[in-house]
Amino acid sequence: MVARVWSLMRFLIKGSVAGGAVYLVYDQELLGPSDKSQAALQKAGEVVPPAMYQFSQYVCQQTGLQIPQLPAPPKIYFPIRDSWNAGIMTVMSALSVAPSKAREYSKEGWEYVKARTK
């Protein structure tokens, strides 16, 4: 009984995380135009490092541990607009071709089975 409840809880937690991720992507319009994706990435780049620093300071205060100061991350310019939409297009293209490819492969497999059974 406990194993079933635990597996159900794991499923619900994973589903909640996945649903939250899908909602966040939809809410932030990350699958839309590239400029919005680029703006979201820049916004995350500005917000995450200070938040991580504040969290590490909080952990130091609460636990008494001394976390060594890490060097600042290098500033790297990566034009995400060039690769983000290319990745999305590749995935969507593969998904749109999948049914016809599955039909072709199953037809080839059926022909192979028919040839072997004769």
Swiss-Prot record:
Residues 1-7 are mitochondrial matrix. It is found in: Mitochondrion inner membrane. One of its GO terms (cellular component) is mitochondrion. One of its GO terms (biological process) is inner mitochondrial membrane organization. The keyword Manganese does not apply. Coiled coil: none annotated. Its main location: mitochondrion. The keyword Transmembrane applies. InterPro entries: Mic13 (IPR026769). It is a single-pass membrane protein. Keywords: Membrane, Mitochondrion, Mitochondrion inner membrane, Primary mitochondrial disease, Transmembrane, Transmembrane helix. Residues 27-118 are mitochondrial intermembrane. Component of the mitochondrial contact site and cristae organizing system (MICOS) complex, composed of at least MICOS10/MIC10, CHCHD3/MIC19, CHCHD6/MIC25, APOO/MIC26, MICOS13/MIC13, APOOL/MIC27 and IMMT/MIC60. The MICOS complex associates with mitochondrial outer membrane proteins SAMM50, MTX1 and MTX2 (together described as components of the mitochondrial outer membrane sorting assembly machinery (SAM) complex) and DNAJC11, mitochondrial inner membrane protein TMEM11 and with HSPA9. Belongs to the MICOS complex subunit Mic13 family. Component of the MICOS complex, a large protein complex of the mitochondrial inner membrane that plays crucial roles in the maintenance of crista junctions, inner membrane architecture, and formation of contact sites to the outer membrane. Constituent of mature MICOS complex, it is required for the formation of cristae junction (CJ) and maintenance of cristae morphology. Required for the incorporation of MICOS10/MIC10 into the MICOS complex. It is linked to Combined oxidative phosphorylation deficiency 37: An autosomal recessive disorder due to mitochondrial dysfunction and characterized by hypotonia, failure to thrive, progressive neurodegeneration with neurologic deterioration after the first months of life, global developmental delay, as well as liver dysfunction. Some patients may have hypertrophic cardiomyopathy, loss of vision and hearing, and/or seizures. Death in first months or years of life is observed in most patients. This is MICOS complex subunit MIC13. It comes from Homo sapiens (Human). The gene is MICOS13.
